Amino acid sequence: RFESGTLMFHLGMSGSLRVCKKDEELKKHDHIELIFNDCCVRYNDPRRFGFCLWYEGDDQDHKLLKSLGPEPLTGAFNFKYFKQAIAKRSAPIKNVIMDSKVVVGAGNIYATESLFICKIHPAKPANELNDDQIQQLLETIKKILKKAITQGGTTLKDFINADGKPGYFQQTLLVYGKKGEPCKVCKTQIESITLAGRASSFCPSCQ
């Protein structure tokens, strides 16, 4: 935030911001450079799904932020909120938890893994979850995201974290991207369906 407005970044799928010395050589896919007195901040995005924009009003009033759901690791994402948010949603539960208007940050990988751990089929209508399933899914999403953060995120192709290093959460993935492989719990072959245009891996026995 600046006195005259806010510079907003969306990192997309592969974007990253890093602080570096002003004389440091530019890296491939460095697109934006913010120069300060003793350092600079560079925005790097190999896949170019992210963006940067300038907004002169209160950033919380911007249309891109105003409609967002709560951050998953805050107290705002709780049982009461989650139950109410899905109560009238008959869409597949995976689509609902990936909807940023419901909760932000639960992308395809983390939604897939959370549903597997909770033994919930990704296509199950959201409003058919019982209270125990809602509570377990809520807690699992939080745990999965915390674990991913401690491991630096998930690097599948070109993702790097703020330190310029790849993440290691992919080494612990249970079902995401495992189509055709045996389930690590019951050995049944992992299957995949498409929901809202995204591949959704699941175990037909466990879920």
Q: Where in this protein do the model-derived segments appear?
A:
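Basic, nucleic-acid-binding surfaces and adjacent catalytic neighborhoods in DNA/RNA-processing proteins
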Residues: 83-207
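Extreme N-terminus of proteins, especially the signal/transit-peptide cleavage junction
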Residues: 1-2, 139
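Phosphate/anion-contacting hairpin/loop surfaces
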Residues: 3-105, 110-117, 125
